[in-house]
């Protein structure tokens, strides 16, 4: 009979800075490195943690659009994806997505250890 294998999962809650993707990604990277050190294989971050969440309803359409990133060329997801590959960890994170048709979405992306990405769009 096969021995059961364990899988370590963790979730992170942190105080993001509104409109400050650089800061938020720096904090996220620190949590990812800590999780890797602790041999975590699945790590989830909050909804819209890259861009910030609570301030968005107060922004103008132009300000929200400026925060959005197309997923395929997203600098934020390029970093998260590279860390997922490096640490062989599934990392989930949220941001404002700009779709190919220009529409904006509250998206949650799972960056997989093999480099693939899977997206859920909140309506």
PLM feature spans:
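Active-site-proximal beta-strand elements of phosphoester/diester hydrolases
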Residues: 6-17, 107, 119-122
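Cys-nucleophile CN-hydrolase/nitrilase-fold catalytic domain and related Cys-dependent amidase chemistry
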Residues: 21, 33-113, 118-119
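Basic/polar N-terminal segments that are highly enriched at the extreme N-terminus
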Residues: 1-5
């Amino acid at each position: 009979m096969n021995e059961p294998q364990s899988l370590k999962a963790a979730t992170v809650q942190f105080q993001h800075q509104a409109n400050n993707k650089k800061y938020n990604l720096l904090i996220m990277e620190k949590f990812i490195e800590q999780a890797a050190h602790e041999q975590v294989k699945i790590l989830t971050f909050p909804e819209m943690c890259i861009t910030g969440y609570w301030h968005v309803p107060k922004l103008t359409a132009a300000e929200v659009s400026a925060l959005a990133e197309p997923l395929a060329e997203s600098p934020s997801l390029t970093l998260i994806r590279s860390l997922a590959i490096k640490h062989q960890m599934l990392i989930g994170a949220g941001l404002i997505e700009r779709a190919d048709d220009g529409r904006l979405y509250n998206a949650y992306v799972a960056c997989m250890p093999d480099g693939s990405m899977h997206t859920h769009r909140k309506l």
